[in-house]
Curated annotation (Swiss-Prot):
Swiss-Prot/TrEMBL keywords: Nucleus, Ribosome biogenesis, rRNA processing
Family: Belongs to the universal ribosomal protein uL1 family. Highly divergent.
Record protein name field: Putative ribosome biogenesis protein C8F11.04
One annotated Gene Ontology cellular component of this protein: preribosome
Keyword Chloroplast attached: no
PANTHER family: RIBOSOMAL PROTEIN L7AE FAMILY MEMBER
Feature: compositional bias, Basic and acidic residues: 292-320
Record organism: Schizosaccharomyces pombe (strain 972 / ATCC 24843)
Length: 373
């Protein structure tokens, strides 16, 4: 599929690629004016040759992350991974079997190290050791059967620096399958999915020609519009090309961008309004239930309060009744004591009368005796 069929317009793809490469060549020449620095800094020249070119895309909608730390593999015509780069292969135990397969397939210059899971856990345990392993190799390949276990073992040091291991299928255990998978991995570019509306994919190097870059860009755009961007090519807002040292050169801008943004906002508002209605409708029965529960609670509380009030009344009345009874008892006791005293008083008066009578009789007798004498 041509770029015109994909985007619906004649995008000057090769012109943009050649303009970017020309800009980079001028930048390098301006930075390396001194001839002596060109002779001495050979490493810098090599690094400039492998300066990556990035395809930057902006989308109308957010891209979800459904890959679970597995990168998208995008086949391209011109490899972005240099053939001189070294790879590390992470495999299941025992690792000796896969080392023999690498030698048998003639990949010992490409896959320079094979590591089993048990050795990876034991030897590269600390953060510093994992960082050294990450910086030692250009690309990491991993048996697709161990991919789910690697995030926990390798940690953030790998996944934050875009050194996500590329899955390869080597379950058959043959040299032919291993060679085919490694060649396919080197002939592709990768995209680590994340929730975003703007992202970049490596599409080549400054050492490539403008035609090679244009071919890679077309392959990437076809894959992205089919597998990554929602709504396909219609969901792309803009396309740019850039390097790490250059500005973003526009390749294509959606001519209907304003209308699409306005329509998408309307759709969003409609969706939010419908979701609010649904939430309100769903909340109505819950509100009714809540009201019923509150009414039931209130009736329960009122009943409990009435019961407690009754208990308090009975508790208050019981002492009164008890006090009345006690008062009655005390009054009865007083009356009994008074009756006893009343009964006892006549006895005392009779005895006193007898005593008085005897004394009076004695006095009378004494008076008679005096008269006789």
């Amino acid at each position: 599929m041509a770029l015109k069929e994909l985007l619906g317009s004649d995008a000057p793809l090769e012109k943009v690629c050649s303009a970017l490469l020309e800009y980079e060549s001028k930048r390098k020449s301006s930075e390396n004016i001194d001839s002596e620095s060109k002779k001495t800094n050979l490493l810098e020249d090599e690094q400039d040759d492998i300066e990556p070119v990035w395809l930057q895309l902006a989308t109308l909608k957010f891209i979800g992350n459904n890959r679970k730390l597995i990168p998208y593999k995008i086949a391209i015509k011109n490899p972005v991974i240099p053939s001189s780069s070294e790879a590390c292969l992470i495999v299941k135990d025992p690792q000796r079997v896969y080392k023999d397969l690498v030698n048998e397939a003639g990949l010992s210059k490409v896959v320079t190290r094979v590591i089993g899971l048990s050795k990876l856990k034991a030897k590269w345990n600390s953060y510093e050791q994992k960082r050294q392993l990450r910086d030692q190799f250009d690309i990491f390949l991993a048996d697709d059967r161990v991919i789910p276990m690697l995030p926990r073992i390798l940690g953030k040091t790998f996944y934050q620096k875009s050194k996500v291991p590329v899955p390869v299928k080597i379950s058959k255990g043959t040299a032919e399958q291993l060679k085919r998978e490694v060649v396919s991995a080197y002939g592709a570019t990768y995209f680590n999915s994340a929730p975003c509306s703007s992202f970049m994919i490596k599409c080549g190097h400054v050492s490539n020609t403008s035609t090679e870059l244009a071919e890679n860009v077309e392959s990437i755009l076809q894959f992205v519009s089919k597998h990554i961007v929602p709504d396909g090519a219609k969901g792309i807002a803009s396309i740019h090309l850039k390097t790490s040292q250059s500005i973003a050169i526009p390749l294509w801008n959606n001519p209907n961008l304003k209308e699409l943004i306005a329509s998408s906002r309307k759709v969003v508002t409609k969706e939010t309004a419908s979701s609010k209605r649904k939430s309100d409708e769903e909340s109505l029965p819950s509100q009714k239930k809540q009201k019923k529960v509150e009414v039931a609670k209130e009736s329960k509380d009122s009943k409990q309060q009435n019961v407690s009030d009754k208990k308090q009344v009975t508790v208050k009345e019981v002492p009164k009744k008890l006090s009345v009874k006690n008062a009655a008892k005390t009054t009865n006791r007083d009356e009994d004591s008074k009756g006893k005293k009343a009964k006892a008083s006549p006895k005392v008066s009779q005895s006193s009368l007898k005593a008085n009578g005897t004394t009076a009789i004695k006095k009378v007798k004494a008076g008679k005796n005096k008269v006789k004498h």
